[in-house]
Structures are given as C-alpha cells and as structure tokens.
C-alpha cells in the first residue's frame, strides 16, 4: 500500500478580512474554515495530514491539535 499525505496550507494573517481572527479560524456554517478541510480529508485513507501554519500558529495549532 502506498503512503498518502495531505498538506493543509493554514498560514496567513487574513488582514484583508479586517478581523482579529486568523483567516483559517473564521467560522463558516458554524465551524472554522480549517475544520471543514480537516473533516473532508478525514474521509480519505491518508497516512498523515500535515498542516502548515504561520501567523497565529499557536491558536491554529490549539484548534487543529492532534488532527494533523
């Protein structure tokens, strides 16, 4: 069986959104945007899920936790 990975690009301050929240943590339909991506990727048979973070890394990491 081959190894399959997914990479979530979750870096970015989101300054154009004019909000104190980081872009990937903005809620869409009751969940942070990044959670929608994680939910969809969790349906796949992946070896590992890698999340790239930048600005607000600690807040993003605290939400993502061990999901990636």
Swiss-Prot record:
Pfam families registered for this protein in UniProt: NTP_transf_3 (PF12804)
EC assignment: 2.7.7.23, 2.3.1.157
Domain of life: Bacteria
GO cellular component: cytoplasm; membrane
Pathway: Nucleotide-sugar biosynthesis; UDP-N-acetyl-alpha-D-glucosamine biosynthesis; N-acetyl-alpha-D-glucosamine 1-phosphate from alpha-D-glucosamine 6-phosphate (route II): step 2/2; Nucleotide-sugar biosynthesis; UDP-N-acetyl-alpha-D-glucosamine biosynthesis; UDP-N-acetyl-alpha-D-glucosamine from N-acetyl-alpha-D-glucosamine 1-phosphate: step 1/1; Bacterial outer membrane biogenesis; LPS lipid A biosynthesis
Subcellular location: Cytoplasm
Broad class of enzyme this protein falls into: transferase
Annotated UDP-N-acetyl-alpha-D-glucosamine binding sites: 9-12, 23
GO molecular function, one term: UDP-N-acetylglucosamine diphosphorylase activity
Gene Ontology BP annotations: cell wall organization; lipid A biosynthetic process; peptidoglycan biosynthetic process; regulation of cell shape; UDP-N-acetylglucosamine biosynthetic process
Cofactor(s) annotated in UniProt: Mg(2+)
Keyword presence, Metal-binding: yes
InterPro entries: GlmU-like, MobA-like_NTP_Trfase, Nucleotide-diphossugar_trans
Free-text cofactor note: Binds 1 Mg(2+) ion per subunit.
Keywords: Acyltransferase, Cell shape, Cell wall biogenesis/degradation, Cytoplasm, Magnesium, Metal-binding, Multifunctional enzyme, Nucleotidyltransferase, Peptidoglycan synthesis, Repeat, Transferase
Family membership: In the N-terminal section; belongs to the N-acetylglucosamine-1-phosphate uridyltransferase family.
Function: Catalyzes the last two sequential reactions in the de novo biosynthetic pathway for UDP-N-acetylglucosamine (UDP-GlcNAc). The C-terminal domain catalyzes the transfer of acetyl group from acetyl coenzyme A to glucosamine-1-phosphate (GlcN-1-P) to produce N-acetylglucosamine-1-phosphate (GlcNAc-1-P), which is converted into UDP-GlcNAc by the transfer of uridine 5-monophosphate (from uridine 5-triphosphate), a reaction catalyzed by the N-terminal domain.
Quaternary assembly: Homotrimer.
Official protein name in the record: Bifunctional protein GlmU
Record lineage: Bacteria, Bacillati, Bacillota, Bacilli, Bacillales
